Amino acid sequence: MGLFRGFVFLLVLCLLHQSNTSFIKLNNNGFEDIVIVIDPSVPEDEKIIEQIEDMVTTASTYLFEATEKRFFFKNVSILIPENWKENPQYKRPKHENHKHADVIVAPPTLPGRDEPYTKQFTECGEKGEYIHFTPDLLLGKKQNEYGPPGKLFVHEWAHLRWGVFDEYNEDQPFYRAKSKKIEATRCSAGISGRNRVYKCQGGSCLSRACRIDSTTKLYGKDCQFFPDKVQTEKASIMFMQSIDSVVEFCNEKTHNQEAPSLQNIKCNFRSTWEVISNSEDFKNTIPMVTPPPPPVFSLLKISQRIVCLVLDKSGSMGGKDRLNRMNQAAKHFLLQTVENGSWVGMVHFDSTATIVNKLIQIKSSDERNTLMAGLPTYPLGGTSICSGIKYAFQVIGELHSQLDGSEVLLLTDGEDNTASSCIDEVKQSGAIVHFIALGRAADEAVIEMSKITGGSHFYVSDEAQNNGLIDAFGALTSGNTDLSQKSLQLESKGLTLNSNAWMNDTVIIDSTVGKDTFFLITWNSLPPSISLWDPSGTIMENFTVDATSKMAYLSIPGTAKVGTWAYNLQAKANPETLTITVTSRAANSSVPPITVNAKMNKDVNSFPSPMIVYAEILQGYVPVLGANVTAFIESQNGHTEVLELLDNGAGADSFKNDGVYSRYFTAYTENGRYSLKVRAHGGANTARLKLRPPLNRAAYIPGWVVNGEIEANPPRPEIDEDTQTTLEDFSRTASGGAFVVSQVPSLPLPDQYPPSQITDLDATVHEDKIILTWTAPGDNFDVGKVQRYIIRISASILDLRDSFDDALQVNTTDLSPKEANSKESFAFKPENISEENATHIFIAIKSIDKSNLTSKVSNIAQVTLFIPQANPDDIDPTPTPTPTPTPDKSHNSGVNISTLVLSVIGSVVIVNFILSTTI
């Protein structure tokens, strides 16, 4: 992802804050530059293209009406796999690739579960990552279960573009309303239907009334909500867009604040329409007075990769070993990273530019060696970036009349006052510019080039032991190559050693990789002693030593052995800087490798605004849980901040166990560029695959009520959501690019960061006490320890949300906060209870740090005290077992709630729900 600073291009860049790879623009009410990518694993079927066009066209009209004539789809690019046959209609893509996909058409995440979903791991109101549709869904084979694809696309689009959430909750499909009835979680509450148990076996089906679980006092897990086929209710698209009458989003009038929907949980009980109407899209448009035109489609077919290296050999590259380090990284790129079949050329530049290699198609090591021989050897002259770029365009143009989709890989360590003069040419070229900035002085204008062309931007310091240059080049794999063909980094580390010390460690090669495994060693002064053993203890020899470039490398033939590889490197100079990089490719094209993708939530930021680090670990589209994930954030002065990333659903992490590991970053040390690198390690019996459907998936409709009878849809394949597959040991590293921070004051930084919001507050009951549990926040967001907690209760959700300080306070004298990310528990006993038929108690927490900074109000936990009113026959005799929580005896406090009306007649049953507020 390209980065930028607002010096030369302040007016252009001031709105481009978020680290989002999408190119979608809103222009005169129409969404432009939407990219829909068909995954290479999808078998060729031209009907898929036809159905995509039909889906978007239908969706455009539906979206236009649903948004009060504000938005429609203007133009869409469909990216077709390279392995599909040629067609005269297909053009070569420009910046469109998998990295910039807004919609991905791919096989289901889990076999047989064609569930559409939107990948979201940020807060309410923030854009999602991408939409995932399956081929069968687009081909209309799942219409009964999910509704027409056009309406479904609008449902998912609202996730993607406006950051709203579903108005149902499969984890809490029912709730007890204030009316004392059990209701299906939905919006609006006016959607009618029946709650039934419907099971089929053999050729017969049985329908019966739902039974109440004696523990939860809600319907059992086998109960489902079957909507009436004929409805009059118009809302909501984020509940069941498949209902014919539904044409609107829930608004303030129709929104159901009682339901434990994900929209309520994540969006502070605001309606979906309220979130949408507060978006920049909404604020910057007015309703149209005429119907919109139909969408325009571009059919683009992936073709062979074309890349030209544009390398700085100016005089400044002679300092700090920069030229040699660039050559080491470029050789690694040419030897290992760039894929077979790619076309590669090379240009050098200083005050002028020189074509060194015209495009060569890589078929074997011969072409790779030819290109390596052309790397620069002597630094001299000034810096003319535009000369280098123009010569790269010339190299590409000699073989291809159009530059569309070709890549320019530009490395420079200097500024060029004339670089901005070729920005328009770059923008119009159709080429992609990747920029590696080496050192503090690298040019700002080129950052803008990478941004507008869809390229990547990396910052690399002069601290060789951080291995930043090799990491940056290694991250520049093709954006459109099948994942099985991509080079994956298993290890990247370095040390500066004294007294001829050793650098010893291990590298794990798991069974998902092993093909084209490549070990690279670099040094600063003298070749080290190198020893490498495979998992069986066999020593690996025959390293190729390149004394000129101060590197040695070894390619493992065939598929490398699975297991732990050990290495010993002994420095022969004092001091000495050594690095090791290990890369590999998928062992089997039919088994997706484990991957790590890292990013920041923003590309540009200003103090004191916090940033968030994200690292997503997947095997295919299935999340990997239980990994140890560490982020390394390096500033321009070489200082590295180390953060443990967590997938615990607390602090910066939006969803627990979704394979996205997150953490706040606030340890700014200076103004300027920072780089991100992530290391992930999964140990045996700790890392595992979570075999559960993806989050934020569209609601599956089990069937319809037609003329009073249930017409069932085919049942979904059953998956035990607690099923997990334990993974073997694995290791991965990944570069997350660069970001820019400004307005950082002199150190030490003032304390401006409150504790992070508690988002996982839970309430249960033990005997006569209410037990609260949550994840501890820190003194500064999720670091350190808070000073104290304030717990308040109310009979009204909105009172806690809007007037927390006026609600009744619980005595927390005995509550001693723990370190951030620890589990907290606290028990209190409600007293002086008055009697009514049924009452809800809502509970929320604020945290206060040592500087008296206060967190946002937590999510709101709800307990309900009531007398069961169901007939004894409706009580399920075999309720779902739930563990009895044990209260923390040190955290036991009474609370006088005489002003709060609770209900108790006879025996009291307390049931918990979890709601949320994000103020």
Swiss-Prot record:
Tissue expression pattern: Primarily expressed in the digestive tract, mainly in colon. Detected in smaller amounts in brain, urogenital organs, testis, and salivary and mammary glands. Highly expressed in the epithelial layer and submucosal gland of the inferior turbinate mucosa. Lower levels in the epithelial layer of nasal polyp.
Spans through the membrane: 895-915
Site (Cleavage): residue numbering on this chain: R697, A698
Protein name per its UniProtKB record: Calcium-activated chloride channel regulator 4
Residues that hold Zn(2+) according to the record: H155, H159, D166
Region described as Disordered: 870-893
Notes on the domains: The metalloprotease region is responsible for autoproteolytic processing. It can also cross-cleave other CLCA substrates.
Cellular component terms (Gene Ontology): apical plasma membrane; extracellular region; plasma membrane
GO molecular function: chloride channel activity; intracellularly calcium-gated chloride channel activity; metal ion binding; metalloendopeptidase activity
Gene3D superfamilies linked: Immunoglobulins, von Willebrand factor, type A domain
Catalytic residues identified in the record: E156
Domain VWFA: 306-476
SUPFAM superfamilies: vWA-like
Signal peptide: 1-21
Superkingdom of this protein's organism: Eukaryota
Glycosylation positions in this chain: N75, N340, N504, N542, N588, N628, N811, N832, N837, N852
PTM statement from Swiss-Prot or TrEMBL: The translation product is autoproteolytically cleaved by the metalloprotease domain in the endoplasmic reticulum into a N-terminal and a C-terminal products that remain physically associated with each other. The cleavage is necessary for calcium-activated chloride channel (CaCC) activation activity.
Subcellular location field: Cell membrane; Apical cell membrane; Secreted
Function summary: May be involved in mediating calcium-activated chloride conductance.
E.C. number(s) listed in UniProt: 3.4.-.-
Name of the top EC class for this enzyme: hydrolase
InterPro entries reported in the protein's UniProt record: CLCA_chordata (IPR004727), CLCA_N (IPR013642), CLCR (IPR051266), Ig-like_fold (IPR013783), VWF_A (IPR002035), vWFA_dom_sf (IPR036465)
NCBIfam families assigned: choice_anch_X, hCaCC
Membrane topology according to the record: Single-pass membrane protein
Stored Pfam families: CLCA, VWA
Any one Gene Ontology BP term: monoatomic ion transmembrane transport
